[in-house]
Amino acid sequence: MADDSASPSPSSASPLQHHREALKSSVRNTAASRRREQAIAIGKERREALIRAKRVCRAPISGSDEAEMEEGDMVVDEEKACLEAKTAHAVEELKSALSIQGKGVQKKKIEALRDLRRLLSQPEVPLVDTAIKAGAVPLLVQYLSFGSSDEQLLEAAWCLTNIAAGEPEETKSLLPALPLLIAHLGEKSSTLVAEQCAWAIGNVAGEGAELRSTLLAQGALRPLTRLMFSSKGSTARTAAWAMSNLIKGPDPKAANELITIDGVLNAIIASLEKEDEELATEVAWVVVYLSALSDRGISLIVRSSVPQLLIGRLFSSENLQLLIPVLRGLGNLIAADDYMVDSVLTVGHNIIDQALSGLIKCLKSDNRVLRKESSWALSNIAAGSFEHKKLIFASEATPVLIRLVTSMQFDIRREAAYTLGNLCVVPTGNCELPKIIVEHLVAIVDGGALPGFIHLVRSADVDTAGLGLQFLELVMRGYPNKQGPKLVEMEDGIEAMERFQFHENEQMRNMANGLVDEYFGEDYGLDE
């Protein structure tokens, strides 16, 4: 993911003058930047991993007549040329059915649409390009005309859905169909037709920012919001999925527009309150993008029941596809608005206990994304009050974080390091060095975390190395009986710091040299 934001370089005059802010900054002060970068990266992540940005519709929508029919055996081993010929013929049949009149014409239209749809739905040979070159899209637009039967509209929208699931240029071919697809999202359309049109729109929105802008300009947001209220689970899920594709950014305009639509927050809450985990998953992605891109959205969401509902899911669910957006949405909210930590995650209330339990579950997961995102969320909570620090420190999170900072991948080490660092300091509220919570520092160092921080000092990433240096300063300044420098030396910390002696980054050079001079100068070791 391209969602890692950098912490400010430490001050050369006072290495930890703003230590709380320095530790906190990578996840709070520059949280908006990281959240926006996430919104860009998530689309690619969903396409390649658990939740695809574009989806082929192979099975009939529940409730349609086709769901009750035998699909018939497709001959899957036909040669590509034969299937392409069938596709071109199916498009010709579409054209022919539009030109005839009289008895049986409607049946012929449906049969022609269904033949094309079945060919576009089969997974063995991609036939979208063949259909487009044969002229399918403008014909399908005609089949979407108002006054057509629901069955015809459904089949036409289904064909367009699978064309939109193709390659980028294939998806762009749907531009002439977008106004009618959006129009059929309206209240006068049947639920089946509206759902299929939402699916097609979701595929188009999943392709890129240019097509999303077109959909927004043509008014797709409001009818999709209405569909999220549908009592039919698959319709609400499809609408939420299409919505998340539509607002994913990087332009925040769509997210800011969405949060102003009457009822959208109520729709999100109502969806999260249902037992439907698939619906909750899609709606959680909507929350992810709103919390990544819209400051107004963040303010409204944190003051609603959404955080409590997300925490409930985090605490109770073992569904990875649900946990990822739930955790990321919570992480965004915690990073973006102090209200989340100060007024929602109040120590002594059940909600913080549930949140901490859910975060620890994710920390211990084998899934890399869950470990990283839970560390990020915890680092922000740990940057809160002394009570929050004590609660996290006393929990199972601390030994797990120590393990992560010493043995995991680089990005997870860094997030875990921010959390552990924040557990060790209390801000003074002025320009002085932060007060060290000695009990926490000693336990974390004695628990084996120091080698992990020295490893960070050796990082090629300057900001990560700065984080490691900041923690070494805490150890050397705050470990009892002036044993901190010796502990750092025993783990080859001096050598790690000396690599910055002639470093091109002046702030890092001054910080590292200042620490070496202060703690390992001429008087070092004389007390022994």
Swiss-Prot record:
Binds specifically and directly to substrates containing either a simple or bipartite NLS motif. Promotes docking of import substrates to the nuclear envelope. It is found in: Cytoplasm, Perinuclear region. Induction: By dark in green leaf. Down-regulated by light. It holds the Pfam family Arm. This is Importin subunit alpha-2. Forms a complex with importin subunit beta-1. The whole complex, most stable and composed of importin alpha, importin beta and NLS substrate, is referred to as PTAC or pore targeting complex. One of its GO terms (cellular component) is perinuclear region of cytoplasm. Keywords: Cytoplasm, Protein transport, Repeat, Transport. PANTHER family: IMPORTIN ALPHA. Residues 1-15 have a biased composition (Low complexity). It comes from Oryza sativa subsp. japonica (Rice). Its main location: cytoplasm. Belongs to the importin alpha family.
